[in-house]
């Protein structure tokens, strides 16, 4: 602990944090700065004590208990006015360190620091156990940890706490962010032509009481808040010799998030997402009215990731058993060479030979990957909680930077469980809240729309009107696929027990893969689906179809909703995520009565369950 009668002040000069003591004998204690393996490291030792304070700007923070107490008690009240930038954020995170378990602390990797430099504490040995975390997974964790608090602050002026915690609204926030972060003019297509978009756009959100409302978002203000909160280039972890820019790494992080947003599984499964760092869709659709623009994030990842996938294929072919692999290797090699932008890349590509040894082949490939601004060809398995759960978790004062949820599925589930929406419930709460969440996730988002279903369902008034669909007229007891919608397959299956009349027929809906394309949110149709009776344009058949969608999709949350309805009003904590309500924690209810089977499940590839980084 600090000596009594001795005061400390903090100052920042470039990447150096200076700590000054007011006594004549101890003053100007300076933190050394060095470059090590591409990582900016600040090393601090309080002279005259055994306490050490380690800060690594592009990673997380570890401080021992005494220094933490000193920071809290002596300086945290006015530190914000004296310390700025990444150093301030690092010290603030150190104060929050007690919020996390010892296991989480051990998972924070201190790259580039040996045990002798760390004072022989053994901390580095524990952290090196987590070497399997890839650069991309780490960078995304850092990106989320710095950007999401700013997003939470920005949207808290537009959305209530309850509205921000609803899963579908979290997805909408990320789409509207992608729309805002454009360098040039924002444009959309109307009638086959590009038109400029206004700086203020409308966003459709679900309210906590089960209604749908529109809010206005200033895209320029959102863009400014987003770019100000992004990590700097020096904060990211990069491969040796990497020329990746701040924008390129940030765009990769946004592409990963958009991949999670567009995941087909999110139509049905709440909780943790398993994804890979390559293979992204080429476009996304925002929830803004009529907005459908190509994503520069996904375009960036397509340009880089496409080469990465080809290089992975070349390595996989090289390591495969003997056969006709030389010809295939040569074809892919020519494809990669055609995408090269510099002479160096062309020479490196030509130097890849199927007969080379493993070490030589890998060195050439790593250099080539770096020149394309991508990590060496590895595939990393990551776990991402729902966007809304992350925002809710941060909104409650937590930090994600000390949690390696990108690799640790348990921490990802922890975020889901702890991101709770506490609702002051009264007798007006009904099943409509859960049904609204389900309806918006399956019908009223960019994945699908009321218009598409209405056009595609046989028997509805607008069936096959103004739609490019390769279908035949429905026949009894058959399954049909709607195509040509720039969508994945949507199947409508006629059940055998139904009548011969198409208008009375009962349909079962199966949705596969991701939706995208020209889906537009239709408020009137959604209100009709929810039974408001405010629109007369939607046919009875569509309402019946949506009821079946709601019934099928809400099976997971049915037990939770039922238990909630019979529980004590106003004394419950409720979680809205995924398809709706996936977990409920009752206050004052015996532990044995709590619902435990609604926790999001973690999915592993059977072959990869024990692997951290997988060389393809």
Curated annotation (Swiss-Prot):
Record-given protein name: Nucleoprotein
Record key words, sorted: Capsid protein, Helical capsid protein, Host nucleus, Viral nucleoprotein, Viral penetration into host nucleus, Virion, Virus entry into host cell
Transmembrane segments: none
InterPro entries, A to Z: NCAP_ISAV_C, NCAP_ISAV_hel, NCAP_ISAV_N
Keyword Ligase found: no
Motif Nuclear localization signal boundaries: 230-233, 473-476
UniProt organism field: Infectious salmon anemia virus (isolate Atlantic salmon/Norway/810/9/99) (ISAV)
GO aspect biological process, one term: viral penetration into host nucleus
Function according to Swiss-Prot or TrEMBL: Encapsidates the negative strand viral RNA, protecting it from nucleases. The encapsidated genomic RNA is termed the ribonucleoprotein (RNP) and serves as template for transcription and replication.
Signal peptide: none
Domain of life: Viruses
A Pfam family per the record: NCAP_ISAV_hel
Predominant subcellular localization, coarse grouping: virion
